[in-house]
Amino acid sequence: MGKNKDVRITITLECTNCPQNKLKRYPGISRYTTQKNRRNTPNRLELKKFCPHCSLHTLHKEIKK
């Protein structure tokens, strides 16, 4: 009897500030990959992470793959 692996999924977090910000250090959009538990957090995940393109801590939201 193995564990059900479908509960924990891999998601991508994308910076919400990068598309609007014109004064970036270099072009591009910051993305992080992480895992979340579907039972504990059924809605979209939002975290404050460091964006190397904006050189700031910004809000990163979960995106669809």
UniProtKB/Swiss-Prot annotation:
One of its GO terms (biological process) is translation. InterPro entries: Ribosomal_bL33, Ribosomal_bL33_CS, Ribosomal_bL33_sf, Ribosomal_zn-bd. Its main location: plastid. GO terms for molecular function: structural constituent of ribosome. SUPFAM superfamilies: Zn-binding ribosomal proteins (SSF57829). Pfam families: Ribosomal_L33 (PF00471). PROSITE patterns: RIBOSOMAL_L33. GO terms for cellular component: chloroplast; ribonucleoprotein complex; ribosome. Keywords: Chloroplast, Plastid, Ribonucleoprotein, Ribosomal protein. It is found in: Plastid, Chloroplast. Belongs to the bacterial ribosomal protein bL33 family. This is Large ribosomal subunit protein bL33c. It comes from Staurastrum punctulatum (Green alga). The lineage of its organism: Eukaryota, Viridiplantae, Streptophyta, Zygnematophyceae, Zygnematophycidae.
